[in-house]
Regions:
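Basic, polyanion-binding surface patches
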Residues: 1-133
Length: 133
């Protein structure tokens, strides 16, 4: 399971509400500019793929596309929505996981120290990958 919080006025919110599914694409730090562009420009009026240079790739179990340049993609179906004030939290069941082979450890788990993956949290972008325990 995974959770994503989105404001109800966002275009992506309407798409998730209508389809009941979404994809989480985990970008790497070399995609910072494209990621920031996609985060601030609405797809309501602009084709983000053509403008950002990112490549849509068909998903295997849901309608929304994967982003080919992202090394980790999670295809999800909405199982619950929780209202949290300014945002709603969509809880999604991961129905398919795509990971670049060279990012897997000997057990087949994602080794995030190899990904240079990043995330956005309130005031900026942060690199993921240092195991604490």
């Amino acid at each position: 399971m995974i959770g994503i919080a989105i404001r109800p006025g966002r275009y992506s919110y309407a798409l998730i509400e209508r389809r009941g599914e979404f994809v989480v694409n985990i970008p790497t730090k070399d995609l910072l500019n494209q990621t920031e562009y996609c985060g601030v420009i609405s797809g309501r009026d602009v084709d983000k793929f053509s403008k950002s240079g990112l490549t849509p790739q068909p998903s295997s179990k849901v309608a929304p596309p994967l982003i080919r340049e992202c090394p980790v993609n999670l295809e999800c179906k909405v199982r619950k929505k929780i209202r949290l004030g300014s945002h709603d939290l969509f809880i999604g069941e991961v129905v398919s996981l795509h990971v670049e082979e060279d990012l897997l450890d000997s057990r087949g788990d994602v080794d995030f120290s190899k990904t240079c993956a990043m995330t956005y949290m309130h005031v900026g972008y942060w690199e993921i990958g240092n195991r604490l325990k």
